[in-house]
């Protein structure tokens, strides 16, 4: 069975019993055993039941085996060695579905470390992201980073549409993501490229989820489970297709010939809608572009566009601007050396400099970064031996990477692109990166998380007339992220 068939079958299983139907069917029975059940536990049980139903009818392709095995051990009430192969009698799998209330009860009584392990299994089982059918299925009932801005500003929940057809810009971005990740690792972080992670479901609420483009400062234990270390770095990658040009383009050639901030700003302004939005200090930006500056080098000739700030964001926007305007971006300009004998194009760093460019807090990408940092911080807190002693400088941080490429020349089309001994065959040539740190306000992040948890609970109540408890970890997050006063 190929990936498309698996995705289609899994999607049909999810549609047979959506989350709302699952709640209506099971929550009353669950509450007979446990009066107040956190939704994070219910969410794990829903995932388990969805996998049980899928695997019962598709025994030639078992999905989520490790998660099923681990949760069956909770049902049995005993903890056996995880390496033991539990028998997967598919004729019995559907019967296990009826034990959902018992499973919820067992999970509620289980130690936090055991429940957190289940969320790590979910992450491991969804690696590959868009190429993993389980990743798509679990995003359906999750407030992901890409949805956060729309939900927060519109107060509405939109149904996840699953896999869709995308334009050339998105296809190009996906095609070059691996190259950009490699560039960040080699020339910015200067660490080994790590495996991409799966879906990080928020262990506290079960409502939020994040999928990271790149992450450093992590490791994997002997079972392949994620371990988040101190000062982990998260990178959100953006490929700027609208700047993809030939090497002979005047602004591209000038940047390669003399890589300075002046030639770089000229390159940025060469597009009718520059990727960096200029505003005079004290002025509120539009929400069109996710990068902004007060530097007059980036001021365009055309009239600046304005747009109103969403009402719910308006009281916070100036403070968020003040936090982020102090950040500086790093620009790395690349070129390549051709070796016709070995048929290679070796990428090298031609210049690096800082610019007064920062993230626009009115843009959806800022909110995307907030949720990524919030969820990743939950995993860090859960992995920490003494969470109460976590310093604000130790928690994960987020950077947005803006990548510019140029098209291959006719002579370069047959050559392999080489970055740190890794070869790429079809990708275009890296031109520059802008690496921009995001400065979140922990209090604002907590406000957004709490607000959306309440919205989500009310939305479920409207659909099912059920009161669901979406527990958040905003207090733990705030304690970790806010700078602690120095002791005398």
Curated annotation (Swiss-Prot):
Matching entries from Pfam families are given as: Viral_alk_exo
Q: Which HAMAP family match?
A: HSV_AN
Q: Which family does it belong to?
A: Belongs to the herpesviridae alkaline nuclease family.
What InterPro entries does its record include? Answer: Herpes_alk_exo, PDDEXK-like_dom_sf, Restrct_endonuc-II-like, Viral_alk_exo
Kindly list the GO CC terms recorded for this protein: host cell cytoplasm; host cell nucleus
Q: What does this protein do?
A: Plays a role in processing non linear or branched viral DNA intermediates in order to promote the production of mature packaged unit-length linear progeny viral DNA molecules. Exhibits endonuclease and exonuclease activities and accepts both double-stranded and single-stranded DNA as substrate. Exonuclease digestion of DNA is in the 5'-> 3' direction and the products are 5'-monophosphate nucleosides. Additionally, forms a recombinase with the major DNA-binding protein, which displays strand exchange activity.
Query: Where is this chain primarily localised?
Result: host cell
Q: What class of enzyme is it?
A: hydrolase
Identify the keywords attached in UniProt to this record, alphabetized: Endonuclease, Exonuclease, Host cytoplasm, Host nucleus, Host-virus interaction, Hydrolase, Nuclease
Q: How does it assemble?
A: Interacts with major DNA-binding protein; this interaction increases the nuclease processivity of the alkaline exonuclease.
Cellular compartment(s): Host nucleus; Host cytoplasm
Q: Name the site position(s) for Required for function.
A: 177, 213, 236, 238
Q: What is its EC number?
A: 3.1.-.-
Gene Ontology MF annotations: DNA binding; endonuclease activity; exonuclease activity
Can you name this protein? Alkaline nuclease
Give the originating organism.
Answer: Human herpesvirus 6A (strain Uganda-1102)
What intrachain disulfides are recorded? Answer: none
């Amino acid at each position: 069975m190929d990936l498309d068939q698996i995705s289609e079958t899994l999607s049909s299983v999810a549609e047979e019993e959506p989350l709302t139907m699952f709640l209506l069917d099971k929550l009353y029975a669950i509450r007979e055993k446990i009066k107040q059940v956190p939704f994070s536990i219910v969410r794990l049980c829903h995932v388990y039941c969805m996998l049980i139903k899928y695997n019962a009818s598709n025994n030639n392709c078992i999905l989520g085996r490790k998660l099923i095995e681990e949760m069956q051990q909770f049902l049995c009430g005993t903890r056996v060695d995880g390496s033991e192969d539990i028998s997967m009698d598919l004729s019995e799998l559907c019967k296990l579905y009826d034990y959902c209330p018992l499973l919820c009860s067992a999970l509620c009584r289980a130690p936090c470390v055991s429940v957190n392990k289940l969320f790590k299994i979910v992450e491991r089982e969804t690696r590959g992201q868009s190429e993993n059918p389980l990743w798509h299925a679990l995003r359906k009932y999750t407030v992901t980073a890409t949805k956060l801005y729309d939900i927060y500003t519109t107060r509405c929940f939109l149904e996840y549409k699953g896999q869709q057809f995308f334009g050339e810009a998105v296809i190009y971005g996906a095609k070059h993501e691996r190259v950009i990740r490699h560039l960040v690792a080699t020339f910015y972080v200067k660490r080994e490229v790590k495996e991409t992670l799966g879906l990080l479901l928020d262990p506290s609420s079960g409502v939020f989820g994040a999928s990271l483009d790149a992450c450093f400062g992590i490791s994997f234990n002997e079972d392949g489970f994620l371990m988040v270390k101190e000062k982990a770095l998260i990178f959100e990658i953006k490929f700027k297709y609208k700047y993809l040009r030939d090497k002979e383009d005047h602004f591209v050639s000038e940047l390669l010939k003399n890589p300075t901030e002046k030639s770089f700003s000229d390159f940025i302004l060469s597009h009718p809608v520059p990727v960096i939005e200029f505003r005079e200090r004290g002025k509120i930006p539009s929400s069109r572009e996710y990068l902004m500056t007060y530097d007059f080098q980036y001021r365009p000739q055309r009239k600046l566009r304005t747009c109103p700030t969403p009402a719910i964001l308006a009281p916070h926007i100036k403070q968020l601007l003040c936090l982020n305007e102090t950040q500086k971006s790093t620009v790395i300009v690349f070129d390549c050396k051709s070796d016709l004998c070995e048929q290679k194009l070796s990428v090298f760093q031609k210049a690096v400099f800082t610019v007064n460019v920062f993230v626009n807090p009115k843009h959806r990408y800022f909110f995307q970064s907030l949720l990524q940092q919030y969820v990743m911080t939950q995993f860090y807190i859960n992995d920490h031996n003494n969470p109460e002693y976590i310093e604000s400088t130790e928690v994960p941080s987020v950077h947005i990477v803006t990548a510019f490429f140029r098209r291959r020349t006719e002579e370069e089309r047959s050559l392999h692109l080489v970055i740190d001994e890794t070869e790429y065959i079809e990708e275009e040539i890296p031109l520059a990166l802008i690496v921009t740190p995001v400065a979140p306000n922990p209090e604002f992040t907590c406000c957004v998380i709490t607000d959306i948890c309440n919205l989500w609970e009310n939305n479920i109540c409207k659909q099912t007339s059920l009161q669901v408890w979406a527990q958040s970890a905003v207090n733990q997050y705030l304690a970790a992220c806010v700078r602690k006063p120095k002791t005398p």
